[in-house]
Amino acid sequence: YSRRFGPLEIAKAASRGEGTPFSILTNIEPDGSLVPPDHKEALRARANQLWHTDSCFKDPPALASVLSARVIAPAGGETEFASTRLGWERLPDSMRARLADTCAWHDYAHSRGKIAPHLASQRERSTLPRVRWRIRWRNPANRRDSLYIASHTCAIEGMAKEEAQELIEQLIAHATAPGHTYLHRWQPGDVIMWDNRSSQHYAVNDYF
C-alpha cells in the first residue's frame, strides 16, 4: 500500500526494525514482560511525547508515515495530531513575513537529549547529522505553506541560541494550541496515514 506513494524510508540505525521499512514501537520484551521505566524503549516512548514531525532530521525528510496498531494498551496510548498548515495560516502576517525565507536546523540527538543526555547513541549521532530546512514548507503539489518546525528543531539561522529556542517553543505551542488538534484513540487493526510536511503529532505515553 505505502509503496504507491514513493520509495520507502529505511528505519534508522540502532532502532527496532533497523535496515527494514518498518519502525517497531513497543514496550514489551521478547519474553512478554513490560520494559522497566529506565529501559531505552521506555525513554524513547517519552521522547515521542514531544510534538514532532517524523524524520525531519533526515535528508530527504519523510513525506508521510503509516502507523498500524497491532497490540494496544488496555487504556491510554492515544496519538494527537495538529495541522502545521493551519498553524502557518494562523500566524500574524508579520511573523509569516519574518519566517518565510528563514531556515532552521533539525537534529535527532537534540530532541532525545531533552529526555536523557545519552539517549541518542553514538551510531545515531554519526549517521544522523543535523540538517537544514526552510521554516516555511511549501507543498509542491498544491502550493500551500506549512510551519515546518518541531521538537527536533535545534537552531534558527541568524538567531542566538536562547532566542531561537524560545521562538521554536512559541511556534510549536501556537501550532498545537487546544482546539486545533485531533486525538486518535487506537483500536487493534487501525491504520492511519499522515503528511509529515503539514502536521505534527505526539504519543500519549501514559501506559508505562
Name each region found by the language model.
Residues 1-193, 197-208:
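Fe(II)/2-oxoglutarate oxygenase catalytic core
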